[in-house]
Amino acid sequence: MVSFCCEVCQDIIKKPKLDQHRSRCHGAYFTCIDCNTTFERTDYRNHTSCMTEAQRYQKGLYRPTKKELKKAKMNGNAVNSKELSPNTDNQNTPAGPTKHSLDENEKDKENKKSKKETVSSPAEQLLALTQNQEISLYKLLKKYNKQASKEDSLDSKEVLKHLAITADAKGNYLVKPITK
């Protein structure tokens, strides 16, 4: 049974009693206790199920039962990759790596090597991400760190050490990498 919290009077109400409470409590809107989703007006009527107690407390460790997986497939809900049991993953994949997958791995390695060789300094890497559009340095650094691995992520101090700002005759500011 799904329970909701009235955000106006802070009462906890089970779903069958929500309509009654809504007529008594003026301007009431509700939040599902299990999934912390807030519902305006009568949107709560469509909310029939959400995460179970096991999902909420176990988070990444939770593995759904076969029954839950079947229900999700029947309802058309997308099941997260974390929720798939490891047995189903192993049954669908072939026993050994195929020649096609090995070729793709080799191509990926070559692409990574060529990317590392072409762009060397952090400033040049950031300038490559701008794609001739105006973007703040903060957003640019955030975008780079999102794409990069943890050991390749950049600190803002390091980036600023490698950048130089110049003004041209028109009064435009140009950001260039410092060459040593």
Curated annotation (Swiss-Prot):
Residues 100-111 have a biased composition (Basic and acidic residues). Belongs to the UPF0743 family. PANTHER family: CELL GROWTH-REGULATING NUCLEOLAR PROTEIN, CELL GROWTH-REGULATING NUCLEOLAR PROTEIN LYAR. Residues 77-95 have a biased composition (Polar residues). One of its GO terms (molecular function) is RNA binding. Coiled coil: none annotated. It comes from Schizosaccharomyces pombe (strain 972 / ATCC 24843). Disulfide bonds: none annotated. Zn(2+) 1 binds at C6, C9, H21, C25. Residues 61-125 are annotated as: Disordered. Zn(2+) 2 binds at C32, C35, H47, C50. This is UPF0743 protein C215.06c. Keywords: Metal-binding, Nucleus, Phosphoprotein, Repeat, Zinc, Zinc-finger. A zinc finger (C2HC LYAR-type) spans 1-26, 27-51. It is found in: Nucleus. GO terms for biological process: negative regulation of transcription by RNA polymerase II; rRNA processing.
